Amino acid sequence: MIQTESRLEVADNTGAREVMCIKVLGGSKRRYASIGDIIKVSVKEATPRGRVKKGEIYNAVVVRTAKGVRRQDGSLIKFDGNAAVLLNNKLEPIGTRIFGPVTRELRSERFMKIVSLAPEVL
């Protein structure tokens, strides 16, 4: 569960290392985001020669949460930390590589690109 002010690691090669959630998109009073939800983020830590700079605002999709996701068969998939992939205004990934596993819940029409780039789909 990600909420405003939550810090997430970045799971792509855009040059951002850490981002902070500044808004959960989808509804005026929506408080939490989980895997597959789109959030608005601010870059808090970036590498020197990356595509993105510290302080810039982007859309991002949550790909891993410590809270996890419950499957239809009753199983629960949890991760060690929270991670997101940065998106442009057309909701396409900015980076060309994805690091770490992602869940099958991202296999919607919108995020097939992320699933195809990921090294492992759980």
Swiss-Prot record:
Keywords assigned by UniProt, alphabetized: Ribonucleoprotein, Ribosomal protein, RNA-binding, rRNA-binding
A biological process term (GO) from this entry: translation
Residue ranges crossing the lipid bilayer per the database entry: none
SUPFAM superfamilies in the record: Ribosomal protein L14 (SSF50193)
One of the Pfam families matching this protein, by short name: Ribosomal_L14
PROSITE patterns in the cross-refs: RIBOSOMAL_L14 (PS00049)
Gene Ontology molecular function, alphabetical: large ribosomal subunit rRNA binding; structural constituent of ribosome
InterPro entries, per database record: Ribosomal_uL14, Ribosomal_uL14_bac-type, Ribosomal_uL14_CS, Ribosomal_uL14_sf
PANTHER family in the cross-refs: 50S/60S RIBOSOMAL PROTEIN L14/L23, LARGE RIBOSOMAL SUBUNIT PROTEIN UL14M
Function noted in UniProt: Binds to 23S rRNA. Forms part of two intersubunit bridges in the 70S ribosome.
Subunit relationships: Part of the 50S ribosomal subunit. Forms a cluster with proteins L3 and L19. In the 70S ribosome, L14 and L19 interact and together make contacts with the 16S rRNA in bridges B5 and B8.
Family: Belongs to the universal ribosomal protein uL14 family.
Designated name of the protein: Large ribosomal subunit protein uL14
